[in-house]
Amino acid sequence: ILLSTQSAAWFTENRAEAYLQTEADWYLDYYFLGGGDMLQIIRDYRQITGKAAMLPKWAYGYIQSQERYESEEEILAIADEFQRRDIGVDCLDLDWMSWPDGQWGQKTFDSNRFPDPSGMIETLHKKGIHFMLSIWPNMSSITADYKEFAEKKLLFPGTEIYNAFKEEGRELYWKQVEKKLACHGIDGWWADSSEPITPEWEHTIEPEAGQAYSEYVHDTFAVMPPEKVNAFGMYHAQTIWEGQCDSFPEKRVVNLTRSGWAGSQRYGTIMWSGDIAASWECLKNQVCAGLQYAASGMLYWTLDIGAFFVKKGRQWYWNGEFDKGMEDPAYRELYIRWMEYAAFLPVFRAHGTDVRREPWALGKTGTTFYEAAEVCIKGRLFIFTGSYGVQK
């Protein structure tokens, strides 16, 4: 059953009953998909919500990321090291803070740390490596991008978040991306924080589910149309899709994002499971999460290999179990098991904080964990070649 609500909703199920509560709907459509098998159900779902977009071939390879690479010099050094070790890497992914210091969300490279972004990306391309960049829907109020949105009244009231529900907002956002970022030859986008309001992150202790939901409803309804709040991620993806298809029709869209809605698959989105914490229990849960996501009709799903958080931090979500990081053989084993699982996912990406994520962080050449990582990455070449053919 597919429901058309874009509002915040609460679903509860137990042995005795199941119920759905939505907060604000002008109307509510129910679609019953009664295909003879799961494949037919997925076909029916996509007939209603749109066909999944095809990614470029490189996006099925190995994507190396880190929280965070800090400079053009570091990125090129990482590319050189992969090449020196003869380990294939298809994409390097630059996390937040590409912008000038203090200008969160500004769609401009920091000229001190990235003096020649076009040259950097051209150098990567010559090595056969693509480049992905993190961009955000919010902009600090001191930035030129924010001021342009504010002048045109295309921000949600009282926030630094652009209004993706308005066509004018989507057009202006892409205009800024194209003028100052896409012009350098960027291959893919990491549309981070596409919720984009997350009150649960403000807690030191994990809030109860009901409390987290109530806070989300309260905070989002105060600034967004209540009947659309859950679909912001999809409208944000529409911004990137329509903009790139118009400006660079020869390039397939790649959009790594954290939130979406029914139909996001038609905008070239890859959903990843967010900032998870390192434990065997979490790895087990990721297997279930990936299967459930795929069953929802979405095509591309991935995760942070080894989990985003490795150590124990102050906040409730910074809850990794390996305070010694890569120095702990137990974490290195968990990391490799995660990588072995991820090698069979639609998208294969290493990312996280607390520890380095390049293969050589696992040990010296010839050691067990290093060789295991090398086998996973090189084996992915054969896996994704077949996967690409099937999906094409």
Each language-model region and where it sits:
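Catalytic-domain carbohydrate-binding cleft regions of carbohydrate-active enzymes
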Residues: 1-392
